[in-house]
Amino acid sequence: MQPRQDQPALQWTPANMERPRAFPFTGNSGIQVRTVGFEPIDYFTLFINQDLINYFATETNRFAEQFLSGDDVSRRSRVNSWYPTDPHEMKQFLGLLFLTGIIRKPAINLYWSTDPLYSTPLFGAIMSRNRFQLLLKFLHFNDNAKMPGAHDPSPDKLFKVRPLLDHLGEKFGEVYTPSCNISIDESLLLWKGRLGFKQYIPLKRARFGIKCFMLCEDSGYTFKFKIYTGKENVPSPAGALSVSERVVADLMEPLLDKGYHLYIDNWYTSIPLLKFLFDHSTLACGTIRSNCKGFPDPVKKAKLKRGEVKAYRSNELLAMKFKDKRDVLMLTTIHNEEMVPGQRLAAHHKPRCIVDYNKYTGRVDRTDQLMQPYDMARKSLKWYKKLACHFLQLATLNSFLVYKKDHGQKALFGISA
């Protein structure tokens, strides 16, 4: 599925408050599973269920066996004390791992310290420090013996976490369906080590790391995600698409033709993309770059004073420039050029499309902010374990947001979102 290419030249005329075409919203939004009588832990197990924990135990045991059968294990190594784990112990281990994100200490061994100043006896009551560290060392999510070779024509760079990502991707889509207003943006998981698909995004808090495209509802619920692993070899005609258009088409696929309103930033926004979405009964609004092909020159080159707006229309498309502290270029199929009061008392009126854009974007950054205080990933972890920890926490946040859908704005354990 892809936007149409080689569109004919658009005819732009000054906008005159035409009411844009609206598609009825037909998405079956809300919780898609029965939650009557659920305790808080039951919302968690909607995403991280017993089957997944059983799988973790199986693959952890498999990797430990593969590691210990190697020739480079010293007789005196602590790993020789390993014995197979089981789902019950794996659940205990994951519970302690999550707890390390709530009770922050600079080193793992301090959780087992008996010093009265910072002891946490719960950890030692559940398992020994050595056992926890062994489980963390051997924690695995796929069978290394099945990993594609270096010369494979299309290697899966996320092989080590693929089953976990596939499981959570499926559950995110099954448990809850977003309401009408959604957004797509990228999240950046901090990683400064060596990695072939590490990205640099200067405006993100982490700046260096693993980039993940996320489709979120305005509540913050993550419905779908896609991890960027480098340029893809996509067969024609999809290979002719820009990366950003391909990302949006992929993430939006299950929500097309249902009247959704999508908000995106200038990395994604293009005229072909918004026309493609419109052809699939999906409206969109986004900031756009000044060099975007087809954007009308009278709007692009307009010299405006603060608070002034210039808008042109071509059928369903509205192109706009608004002068605030700086020029803001917008492209939308949702709005006309209506102006509404700004949020501050002394603020100028602003185009409604900018007010709505500011309201419905930024959810991915908000998700990152909500998870950051409870980060359970240590700097010493390998990249795939850090990525796994991140998505386990994302699943936990999604479970909390579903809990809130059932219980209103009530906080849980002092945590609110």
Question: Could you describe each region identified by the protein language model?
Answer:
Residues 1-275, 281-283, 287-292, 335, ...:
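N-terminal initiation segments
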